[in-house]
Amino acid sequence: MMTLNSLSPAESKAISFLDTSRFNPIPKLSGGFSLRRRNQGRGFGKGVKCSVKVQQQQQPPPAWPGRAVPEAPRQSWDGPKPISIVGSTGSIGTQTLDIVAENPDKFRVVALAAGSNVTLLADQVRRFKPALVAVRNESLINELKEALADLDYKLEIIPGEQGVIEVARHPEAVTVVTGIVGCAGLKPTVAAIEAGKDIALANKETLIAGGPFVLPLANKHNVKILPADSEHSAIFQCIQGLPEGALRKIILTASGGAFRDWPVEKLKEVKVADALKHPNWNMGKKITVDSATLFNKGLEVIEAHYLFGAEYDDIEIVIHPQSIIHSMIETQDSSVLAQLGWPDMRLPILYTMSWPDRVPCSEVTWPRLDLCKLGSLTFKKPDNVKYPSMDLAYAAGRAGGTMTGVLSAANEKAVEMFIDEKISYLDIFKVVELTCDKHRNELVTSPSLEEIVHYDLWAREYAANVQLSSGARPVHA
């Protein structure tokens, strides 16, 4: 973790790191790094009211454990920590299993759930030997059973959504890693919370769509929601030990995605292959496109609001091309705390699985960060014209209720249509905006789980058939 006093990343153009064994020290700043920022005469560190607001007679947000006083140990298992993985064949799931494979003395898998990749799921079962496995696509259940017919131990297999839910609330599991993309991850997460499982949350929609319902439920069951994505994990790490009321601002860093160096005028020429070329991260197609549009960051703003209780005015997005600083917080005394590391999703996943401990990692498979070799870190403000997703996300967040879920679902459908080449890249923003506009008259401020799911489905259907300003509709196969 790094601390920068009285520094706003949007005003700082670069941070440079020098190897003092090769260069002379920088005057006035010992420690081998220099800070350069534009507009030297401009004031910074303006007074911003405390961004942490906790309603009366309610507990702090679930992602605040360890903030002031560490909890007493409550280990209730013997041997390696038992975990369930919902979405085991996706990017989050496979990286979670990589961690388990490298740390068999720390973690063991008791249940796995996947969507449709039966071949990979069968391989995972053979390697990690869970007691329960589920495949969401019920039509593939016989294929899975055939693939595991010669298994040397008794395995329970449950098909469909109910199977995924049973994996999420498996009685042996202590922590459930939720890696399913979209609102499909909401019901399993709710089931895990009701069963008292701590949540390693990699499914943004759980809070973006379900925040008004999920957070009170987590408080009720004394469940910890531990963020497994890099940005919120960074914030979570920075707030450890932070007194209540000390948080002033959250600063989410963004790589800028595939088009950060493209002129706005060229965006009308974007092809699917262009959007899938992320400069820093190796991720799935949907999240890679979200990174290009910056919708991922807009959704993370909403998630940060729910996780950490920050007002939207006190959550800032900063473009940081190197993706070394994963996010920052500013405290009331104008200190800025940052979490740094190579862009590797295994790091935040591991932290959610091991918290409050830190698991030692091999330097071969987990390279250490060398700031002197890195050289410098740069920052810039995002362009609202290039990234209209930011305004859409902040507006949806401030509207609250079901609007955030509608935004997320409409974006998911729009990205799907873009990847299938049914709409253009710029149409993604139009589809989301028109869907949110249509929802304004039906907004539910305090939705039930059923209402959250209903408007998720409605938004997808509306987005799939929305008439664009050009008069065109999405092209269906």
Curated annotation (Swiss-Prot):
Residues binding 1-deoxy-D-xylulose 5-phosphate, per UniProt: K204, S230, E231, S255, H278, S291, N296, K297, E300
Binding, NADPH: T89, G90, S91, I92, G115, N117, N203, E205, G284
Keyword check for S-adenosyl-L-methionine: no
Keyword Transport applies: no
Protein location: Plastid, Chloroplast stroma
InterPro entries (UniProt xref): DXP_reductoisomerase (IPR003821), DXP_reductoisomerase_C (IPR013644), DXP_reductoisomerase_N (IPR013512), DXPR_C (IPR026877), DXPR_C_sf (IPR036169), NAD(P)-bd_dom_sf (IPR036291)
Keywords: Chloroplast, Isoprene biosynthesis, Manganese, Metal-binding, NADP, Oxidoreductase, Plastid, Transit peptide
Lineage top rank: taxon: Eukaryota
Regulation: induction: Circadian-regulated with a peak in the late period of the light phase.
Needed cofactors: Mn(2+); Mg(2+)
Deleted gene: phenotype: Albino and dwarf phenotype.
Substrates-to-products reaction catalysed: 2-C-methyl-D-erythritol 4-phosphate + NADP(+) = 1-deoxy-D-xylulose 5-phosphate + NADPH + H(+)
Pfam family, one: DXP_redisom_C
UniProt-annotated stretches for the region Disordered: 56-80
EC number from the UniProt entry: 1.1.1.267
Pathway stated in the Swiss-Prot or TrEMBL entry: Isoprenoid biosynthesis; isopentenyl diphosphate biosynthesis via DXP pathway; isopentenyl diphosphate from 1-deoxy-D-xylulose 5-phosphate: step 1/6
PANTHER family on file: 1-DEOXY-D-XYLULOSE 5-PHOSPHATE REDUCTOISOMERASE, 1-DEOXY-D-XYLULOSE 5-PHOSPHATE REDUCTOISOMERASE, CHLOROPLASTIC
Stated role: Enzyme of the plastid non-mevalonate pathway for isoprenoid biosynthesis that catalyzes the NADPH-dependent rearrangement and reduction of 1-deoxy-D-xylulose-5-phosphate (DXP) to 2-C-methyl-D-erythritol 4-phosphate (MEP). Required for chloroplast development.
Further facts: Plants over-expressing DXR show increased levels of plastid isoprenoids derived from the methylerythritol 4-phosphate (MEP) pathway, such as chlorophylls, carotenoids, and taxadiene.
Protein name: 1-deoxy-D-xylulose 5-phosphate reductoisomerase, chloroplastic
